[in-house]
Amino acid sequence: MKFISNLLLLSEVFPYFTRGSNIKNKFQIIRSIMFGNSRIVKFTNGINYTIPISLHSLFVNLLQIERYSQIFDLKDSKIEVSFDTQNKFYLSLKLDEEDKRLLALLAYGIVDGAVFLDMEHNTKIINDKVIKIIQGNRSTIETSEGIKFFLDSIGPDSIVETYVRRIHDNYSYDLQNKIVIDAGASIGDTPLYFASKGATVYAFELTKRNYDQMLDNLQLNSSLSKQIIPVNAGVGKDGIIEYNENISKENYDGAASFVVNKYGQNSVKRKVKGMTVKTIIETYSISDVYLLKLDCKGCEYYLKKEELHNIHRLKIEYYSYLKNHKLSDLVKLLKESNFDILIFKHNPNDMGQLGNRGNIVAEKII
């Protein structure tokens, strides 16, 4: 089983071993992966990097950046990276928390067409995939909308999903002066996105870690934060709920679930207040929900038909690896509640089937 697992890890690395690669020690890397050792990568320009086996995804991110960059050089004990020779970013060889997130952000973003600007680059030429990176004592990033985040308080994948891949864009939405309930608000990326479109957002986050980072990021966006009500609570069940939180070193998005534990030895059990959608609507005296967004690792299967009466639209990231929960059951509930639905992949690079993971956009038929 371990051998097969290592083969899968190796398959993630092979695309960067093709002709034209600047990696000197390909066979040594293959051997280290197969035997479960730390990865030492040596580039032809003299840069050497040692990355622990526990940080395999970061290792792949490093290879991605080297492949797509036009500048990848060692400068003052830091790696200088540029994709366009104009905008330059610096990664410490020590890989602290900011560096890890920057590494992942650059890797995920460049694959999806992100345009990265550094702090020195002020341009009026801008598109909706621009992310400006301001490196300093506590680095920040800024989206094309002007929304800011602390670099050490982001989930790189969710930032790319929301502000590069734009998975929440929907031309039929008019969020101005509307109510959004966001279950799985993470570090504040989606609440700030919805608020920038004019919505009032009730932002529910299960984990204390993500919740605290959301509060940090809201402080950077004082105007938009007035439209956001952050709540440290799980959505789906009332009362105190026990959940499983992923505490692996590569879990930048703070993944957690009260429905299933798929994190194994990398998980820890914690407790938090839980609220059903019905309780949320009653507690906050919400009469009309324009959009219910669910990205909560299984809580979508706890929706009840009677909770959907005053909800006009849903945006659900669903998971079907859960025992006793099927995508077909969720689809049936929505259709019986008079919703028109569309199912799609939110990540075109995801090799899995739609039956396992995807997005549902639902709109009530009038």
What do these predicted ranges mean?
Residues 1-366:
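Phosphate/nucleotide-binding beta-alpha loop and adjacent structural elements of enzyme active sites
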